[in-house]
Amino acid sequence: MSTEITHHQAMINGYRMHYVTAGSGYPLVLLHGWPQSWYEWRNVIPALAEQFTVIAPDLRGLGDSEKPMTGFDKRTMATDVRELVSHLGYDKVGVIGHDWGGSVAFYFAYDNRDLVERLFILDMIPGLIKAGDSFPIPVALMINHIFFHGGNPDWATALISKDVNLYLRRFLTTLDYNYSPNVFSEEDIAEYVRVNSLPGSIRSGCQWYATGLREDTENLAKATDKLTIPVIAWGGSHFLGDIRPAWQEVAENVEGGAVENCGHFVPEEKPQFVIDTALKFFAPLR
Protein backbone atom coordinates (compact mmCIF):
# COMPACT_ATOMS: atom_id res chain seq x y z
CA MET A 1 0.00 0.00 0.00
CA SER A 2 1.34 3.38 -1.02
CA THR A 3 2.17 6.11 1.48
CA GLU A 4 2.89 8.67 -1.24
CA ILE A 5 0.99 11.91 -0.65
CA THR A 6 -0.79 13.07 -3.80
CA HIS A 7 -2.08 16.62 -4.32
CA HIS A 8 -5.42 17.32 -6.00
CA GLN A 9 -7.81 20.16 -6.78
CA ALA A 10 -11.57 20.05 -7.26
CA MET A 11 -14.42 22.53 -7.56
CA ILE A 12 -16.35 22.15 -4.31
CA ASN A 13 -19.39 24.29 -3.44
CA GLY A 14 -18.35 26.91 -5.97
CA TYR A 15 -14.67 27.31 -5.09
CA ARG A 16 -11.45 25.47 -5.87
CA MET A 17 -10.43 23.18 -3.02
CA HIS A 18 -6.94 21.77 -2.65
CA TYR A 19 -6.63 18.44 -0.87
CA VAL A 20 -4.20 15.56 -0.49
CA THR A 21 -4.73 11.82 -0.41
CA ALA A 22 -2.61 8.85 0.56
CA GLY A 23 -2.96 5.13 1.10
CA SER A 24 -5.88 2.81 0.44
CA GLY A 25 -8.71 1.22 2.36
CA TYR A 26 -11.44 2.70 4.53
CA PRO A 27 -11.44 6.53 4.22
CA LEU A 28 -10.38 8.83 7.04
CA VAL A 29 -10.92 12.58 6.63
CA LEU A 30 -8.44 14.84 8.49
CA LEU A 31 -9.51 18.44 9.14
CA HIS A 32 -6.96 21.07 10.14
CA GLY A 33 -7.17 24.26 12.18
CA TRP A 34 -5.83 27.80 11.94
CA PRO A 35 -3.24 28.98 10.86
CA GLN A 36 -2.61 25.63 9.30
CA SER A 37 -3.44 23.48 6.31
CA TRP A 38 -3.32 19.82 5.35
CA TYR A 39 0.38 20.13 6.25
CA GLU A 40 -0.37 19.86 9.97
CA TRP A 41 -1.02 16.14 9.37
CA ARG A 42 2.32 15.53 7.60
CA ASN A 43 3.71 13.41 10.46
CA VAL A 44 0.49 11.43 10.86
CA ILE A 45 -0.53 10.67 7.28
CA PRO A 46 2.16 8.09 6.36
CA ALA A 47 1.36 5.74 9.25
CA LEU A 48 -2.41 6.07 8.85
CA ALA A 49 -2.09 5.54 5.10
CA GLU A 50 -0.64 2.08 5.68
CA GLN A 51 -4.11 0.95 6.77
CA PHE A 52 -6.55 3.60 5.48
CA THR A 53 -7.22 6.00 2.65
CA VAL A 54 -6.36 9.41 4.10
CA ILE A 55 -8.05 12.56 2.76
CA ALA A 56 -6.80 15.89 4.09
CA PRO A 57 -8.30 19.04 2.54
CA ASP A 58 -7.22 22.63 2.85
CA LEU A 59 -10.44 24.00 4.30
CA ARG A 60 -12.27 26.97 2.81
CA GLY A 61 -10.00 30.02 2.52
CA LEU A 62 -6.83 28.45 3.91
CA GLY A 63 -3.83 26.58 2.59
CA ASP A 64 -3.75 26.34 -1.18
CA SER A 65 -7.54 26.33 -1.50
CA GLU A 66 -9.33 29.29 -3.05
CA LYS A 67 -10.33 32.25 -0.84
CA PRO A 68 -14.07 32.92 -1.28
CA MET A 69 -15.60 35.94 0.41
CA THR A 70 -18.27 34.11 2.42
CA GLY A 71 -19.22 30.76 3.89
CA PHE A 72 -16.87 30.59 6.87
CA ASP A 73 -19.32 29.38 9.49
CA LYS A 74 -18.39 25.84 10.41
CA ARG A 75 -21.68 24.33 9.28
CA THR A 76 -21.15 25.65 5.75
CA MET A 77 -17.55 24.45 5.83
CA ALA A 78 -18.86 21.03 6.84
CA THR A 79 -20.94 20.98 3.67
CA ASP A 80 -17.69 21.55 1.76
CA VAL A 81 -16.27 18.41 3.36
CA ARG A 82 -19.44 16.46 2.57
CA GLU A 83 -19.24 17.55 -1.08
CA LEU A 84 -15.57 16.53 -1.24
CA VAL A 85 -16.37 13.09 0.17
CA SER A 86 -19.22 12.76 -2.35
CA HIS A 87 -16.89 13.88 -5.14
CA LEU A 88 -14.52 11.08 -4.16
CA GLY A 89 -17.32 8.53 -4.13
CA TYR A 90 -17.36 7.50 -0.47
CA ASP A 91 -20.53 6.75 1.48
CA LYS A 92 -18.93 6.07 4.91
CA VAL A 93 -16.00 7.84 6.56
CA GLY A 94 -14.22 8.36 9.84
CA VAL A 95 -13.14 11.89 10.77
CA ILE A 96 -10.34 13.51 12.76
CA GLY A 97 -10.56 17.23 13.51
CA HIS A 98 -8.16 19.59 15.27
CA ASP A 99 -8.80 23.17 16.38
CA TRP A 100 -11.43 24.74 14.09
CA GLY A 101 -11.28 21.53 12.09
CA GLY A 102 -12.82 19.88 15.14
CA SER A 103 -15.80 22.22 14.99
CA VAL A 104 -16.17 21.57 11.26
CA ALA A 105 -15.94 17.84 12.03
CA PHE A 106 -18.74 18.19 14.59
CA TYR A 107 -21.16 19.72 12.08
CA PHE A 108 -20.05 17.25 9.41
CA ALA A 109 -21.00 14.40 11.75
CA TYR A 110 -24.10 16.14 13.12
CA ASP A 111 -25.63 16.86 9.71
CA ASN A 112 -24.51 13.63 8.02
CA ARG A 113 -25.30 10.85 10.46
CA ASP A 114 -25.51 8.21 7.75
CA LEU A 115 -22.04 9.15 6.48
CA VAL A 116 -19.75 9.72 9.50
CA GLU A 117 -19.21 6.58 11.57
CA ARG A 118 -16.61 7.72 14.13
CA LEU A 119 -15.28 11.09 15.29
CA PHE A 120 -11.84 11.84 16.79
CA ILE A 121 -11.37 15.38 18.16
CA LEU A 122 -8.08 17.05 19.12
CA ASP A 123 -7.95 20.10 21.42
CA MET A 124 -11.24 21.65 20.37
CA ILE A 125 -14.76 21.94 21.70
CA PRO A 126 -17.87 21.77 19.46
CA GLY A 127 -18.00 25.57 19.26
CA LEU A 128 -16.63 28.50 21.22
CA ILE A 129 -19.86 29.15 23.06
CA LYS A 130 -23.62 28.84 22.70
CA ALA A 131 -25.62 31.95 21.89
CA GLY A 132 -26.69 33.57 25.14
CA ASP A 133 -23.86 32.13 27.25
CA SER A 134 -20.82 34.02 28.56
CA PHE A 135 -17.10 33.28 28.55
CA PRO A 136 -15.55 32.82 32.01
CA ILE A 137 -12.77 35.40 32.40
CA PRO A 138 -9.95 32.81 32.78
CA VAL A 139 -11.05 31.11 29.56
CA ALA A 140 -11.35 34.42 27.72
CA LEU A 141 -7.81 35.35 28.77
CA MET A 142 -6.43 31.99 27.64
CA ILE A 143 -8.01 32.30 24.19
CA ASN A 144 -7.70 36.08 23.83
CA HIS A 145 -6.50 35.78 20.21
CA ILE A 146 -10.02 34.67 19.29
CA PHE A 147 -11.41 38.09 20.15
CA PHE A 148 -8.60 39.87 18.31
CA HIS A 149 -9.13 37.80 15.15
CA GLY A 150 -12.90 37.64 15.26
CA GLY A 151 -14.10 40.73 17.10
CA ASN A 152 -13.18 43.10 14.28
CA PRO A 153 -11.87 40.82 11.53
CA ASP A 154 -11.15 43.59 9.04
CA TRP A 155 -8.92 45.40 11.55
CA ALA A 156 -7.20 42.15 12.55
CA THR A 157 -6.62 41.31 8.89
CA ALA A 158 -5.01 44.69 8.27
CA LEU A 159 -2.69 44.41 11.26
CA ILE A 160 -1.61 40.79 10.79
CA SER A 161 -1.05 41.32 7.06
CA LYS A 162 1.60 43.94 7.83
CA ASP A 163 3.99 41.16 8.90
CA VAL A 164 2.60 37.65 8.54
CA ASN A 165 5.96 36.08 9.32
CA LEU A 166 6.33 37.96 12.61
CA TYR A 167 2.79 37.21 13.73
CA LEU A 168 2.77 33.52 12.85
CA ARG A 169 6.26 32.92 14.19
CA ARG A 170 5.12 34.25 17.55
CA PHE A 171 1.82 32.36 17.38
CA LEU A 172 3.47 29.03 16.57
CA THR A 173 6.35 29.21 19.05
CA THR A 174 4.86 30.85 22.14
CA LEU A 175 4.31 28.76 25.24
CA ASP A 176 0.81 30.24 25.37
CA TYR A 177 -0.19 27.40 23.04
CA ASN A 178 2.70 24.91 23.01
CA TYR A 179 4.24 22.72 25.69
CA SER A 180 7.62 23.29 23.98
CA PRO A 181 8.79 26.22 21.80
CA ASN A 182 10.53 23.77 19.46
CA VAL A 183 7.51 22.03 17.95
CA PHE A 184 7.83 23.76 14.59
CA SER A 185 10.99 23.70 12.48
CA GLU A 186 12.01 26.63 10.31
CA GLU A 187 10.69 24.66 7.35
CA ASP A 188 7.33 24.22 9.07
CA ILE A 189 7.04 27.90 9.94
CA ALA A 190 8.02 28.86 6.39
CA GLU A 191 5.24 26.69 4.97
CA TYR A 192 2.60 28.22 7.24
CA VAL A 193 3.87 31.70 6.42
CA ARG A 194 3.70 30.85 2.71
CA VAL A 195 0.08 29.72 2.69
CA ASN A 196 -1.04 32.52 5.01
CA SER A 197 0.68 35.10 2.80
CA LEU A 198 -1.44 34.14 -0.21
CA PRO A 199 -3.93 36.87 -1.16
CA GLY A 200 -7.07 36.60 0.95
CA SER A 201 -5.71 34.01 3.37
CA ILE A 202 -5.46 36.17 6.49
CA ARG A 203 -8.89 37.63 5.80
CA SER A 204 -10.30 34.11 5.48
CA GLY A 205 -8.70 33.01 8.73
CA CYS A 206 -10.08 36.00 10.62
CA GLN A 207 -13.50 35.18 9.18
CA TRP A 208 -13.19 31.69 10.66
CA TYR A 209 -13.01 33.41 14.05
CA ALA A 210 -15.63 36.06 13.29
CA THR A 211 -18.21 33.41 12.44
CA GLY A 212 -17.08 31.46 15.48
CA LEU A 213 -18.25 34.37 17.63
CA ARG A 214 -21.46 34.90 15.66
CA GLU A 215 -23.15 32.34 13.36
CA ASP A 216 -21.51 29.34 15.02
CA THR A 217 -22.92 30.29 18.43
CA GLU A 218 -26.45 30.25 17.03
CA ASN A 219 -25.91 26.92 15.30
CA LEU A 220 -24.45 25.36 18.44
CA ALA A 221 -27.42 26.48 20.54
CA LYS A 222 -29.71 24.66 18.10
CA ALA A 223 -27.64 21.44 18.07
CA THR A 224 -29.72 19.63 20.68
CA ASP A 225 -29.95 16.17 19.09
CA LYS A 226 -26.88 14.40 20.47
CA LEU A 227 -24.53 12.37 18.30
CA THR A 228 -24.79 8.64 18.90
CA ILE A 229 -21.62 7.54 17.11
CA PRO A 230 -18.41 6.82 19.08
CA VAL A 231 -16.48 10.03 19.82
CA ILE A 232 -13.03 10.38 21.34
CA ALA A 233 -11.91 13.83 22.45
CA TRP A 234 -8.37 14.58 23.59
CA GLY A 235 -7.08 18.00 24.58
CA GLY A 236 -3.50 19.03 25.24
CA SER A 237 -2.77 19.06 28.98
CA HIS A 238 -1.19 22.52 28.66
CA PHE A 239 -4.04 24.09 26.69
CA LEU A 240 -7.67 22.93 26.75
CA GLY A 241 -6.98 19.84 28.84
CA ASP A 242 -9.73 17.25 29.28
CA ILE A 243 -12.37 18.29 26.76
CA ARG A 244 -14.74 15.39 27.36
CA PRO A 245 -17.29 17.44 29.34
CA ALA A 246 -17.83 19.81 26.40
CA TRP A 247 -18.32 16.92 24.00
CA GLN A 248 -20.62 15.05 26.36
CA GLU A 249 -23.04 17.94 25.90
CA VAL A 250 -23.41 17.08 22.21
CA ALA A 251 -22.62 13.35 22.05
CA GLU A 252 -23.78 10.30 24.00
CA ASN A 253 -20.69 8.12 23.67
CA VAL A 254 -17.54 10.11 24.49
CA GLU A 255 -14.15 8.90 25.68
CA GLY A 256 -10.76 10.61 25.83
CA GLY A 257 -8.96 12.89 28.26
CA ALA A 258 -5.85 15.06 28.28
CA VAL A 259 -2.63 14.35 26.36
CA GLU A 260 0.19 14.80 28.86
CA ASN A 261 3.05 17.23 28.19
CA CYS A 262 1.22 18.64 25.19
CA GLY A 263 -0.14 22.02 24.19
CA HIS A 264 -2.67 22.95 21.53
CA PHE A 265 -1.00 21.63 18.37
CA VAL A 266 -1.47 17.95 19.18
CA PRO A 267 -0.88 16.46 15.69
CA GLU A 268 2.49 18.21 15.54
CA GLU A 269 3.47 17.99 19.21
CA LYS A 270 2.43 14.36 19.73
CA PRO A 271 2.05 12.73 16.30
CA GLN A 272 2.70 9.21 17.61
CA PHE A 273 -0.10 9.60 20.14
CA VAL A 274 -2.45 10.64 17.34
CA ILE A 275 -1.33 7.73 15.16
CA ASP A 276 -1.68 5.10 17.89
CA THR A 277 -5.03 6.42 19.08
CA ALA A 278 -6.45 6.72 15.57
CA LEU A 279 -5.35 3.25 14.50
CA LYS A 280 -7.01 1.71 17.55
CA PHE A 281 -10.16 3.85 17.38
CA PHE A 282 -10.84 3.40 13.68
CA ALA A 283 -9.78 -0.27 13.51
CA PRO A 284 -13.40 -1.56 13.68
CA LEU A 285 -14.13 0.29 10.43
CA ARG A 286 -11.45 -1.43 8.37
UniProtKB/Swiss-Prot annotation:
Keywords: Aromatic hydrocarbons catabolism, Cell membrane, Cytoplasm, Hydrolase, Membrane. GO terms for molecular function: epoxide hydrolase activity. Residues 26-123 form the AB hydrolase-1 domain. It is a peripheral membrane protein. The active site is at residues 99, 209, 264. It catalyses: an epoxide + H2O = an ethanediol. It is found in: Cytoplasm; Cell membrane. Induction: Expressed constitutively at a low level. Induced by cyclohexane oxide and (+/-)trans-1,2-dihydroxycyclohexane. Its main location: cytoplasm. Its EC number is 3.3.2.10. GO terms for biological process: catabolic process. It comes from the Bacteria. One of its GO terms (cellular component) is cytoplasm. InterPro entries: AB_hydrolase_1 (IPR000073), AB_hydrolase_fold (IPR029058), Epox_hydrolase-like (IPR000639), Epoxide_hydrolase (IPR016292). Involved in catabolic degradation of epoxides. Shows highest activity towards C6 and C7 carbocyclic epoxides. Also active towards linear 1,2-epoxyalkanes. Belongs to the AB hydrolase superfamily. Epoxide hydrolase family. Homotetramer. This is Soluble epoxide hydrolase.
